[in-house]
Amino acid sequence: MEARGAGRARLLPALALSALLLGGCATQTAALRAAAPPGVPPRLELAAMPFFAQERYQCGPAALAMALGAAGVLVAPDALVPQVYLPEREGSLQVEMLAAARRNGALGVTIAPRLDALLEELQAGHPVLVLQNLSLPIFPRWHYAVVTGYDLAQGDIVLNSGTTEHMVMAMSTFEHTWARSGYWAMVALPPGQLPVSSDKQTVLDALVAWERNGKPDAVRHSYAAADRRWPGELGLQLGLGNTAYAAGDRAGAADAFRRATLAHPDSAPAFNNLAFVLSELGDYGAARAAAGRALALGGPWRAEAQATLETIERAERGRR
């Protein structure tokens, strides 16, 4: 799905478009106004939000620059244009928005596709970047905006959108426009912070993607936060060990991998990685034992474990 800048869709008669946007049943809005989630205040607006007015068709770079700025990453929309804007589509793909957030030092991750989840993120201090369709489903006009607040009593959502800062929109209208994107939304968070509404697999996938091109120490902080939220999760423990190693902290890496082997005694990758790091730390006996366990577990990691064991033995002989 692509997000196109405003102004490209065929214009509809104003009355027809108004009826389209406001008609129907905004079920999530009605439920929220009837009973807000526990702990969610009736009204909230994030303070000191950066604002960038979009250029023609470039709502993606502007919205992402605002979300990144709120996370402490100061980058101008113009610098994001080559990273996310596709001239032939006159818009930005969601996958590029997530990748660009990570490339610039923030954890870009989707949130749960629900209005209550959006409000929970705002309560946590996370502005939410949303994709809307401001026109007909059959003739979409995709648009990125940043949600910065809400008022349940008034039934309003507050956005930084297009060239308008602090745009107030009826929550029911917002829900209709957002629903047409499948309720797609993301947050861009500084290292060590996690979305409050995203599930474990969504966060893990985002961290793995960030690990590929992010600074190891930054990604490590977010892995550590996720490991605290979901203790004992193998993927998070391995990621924590990998990023600690990449950041130059071999003792920290060994600790993460060791905890992974204790929680998952049948994980060949955990034992193999532990063996590799222990060897570099000079603990050859423990390294050989870990590599032997990885080898004994067999499976697709058998060849890798054999290579690790041979590397350990060569290193040990070289020290004699």
Pin down the residues of each PLM region.
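Noncatalytic regulatory segments and standalone regulatory/sensor domains
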Residues: A26-L32, L152-G239
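Cysteine-nucleophile protease catalytic domains, especially the papain-like/related folds used
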Residues: A26-R114, L118, L189-Q193, D205-A209, ...
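Structural marker of alpha-solenoid helical repeat scaffolds
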Residues: R229, A263-H264, L297-G298
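Alpha-solenoid helical repeat scaffolds
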Residues: G235-G239, P269-N273, A303-T308
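Active-site-adjacent substructure of cysteine-protease-like catalytic cores
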Residues: L107, I111-N160
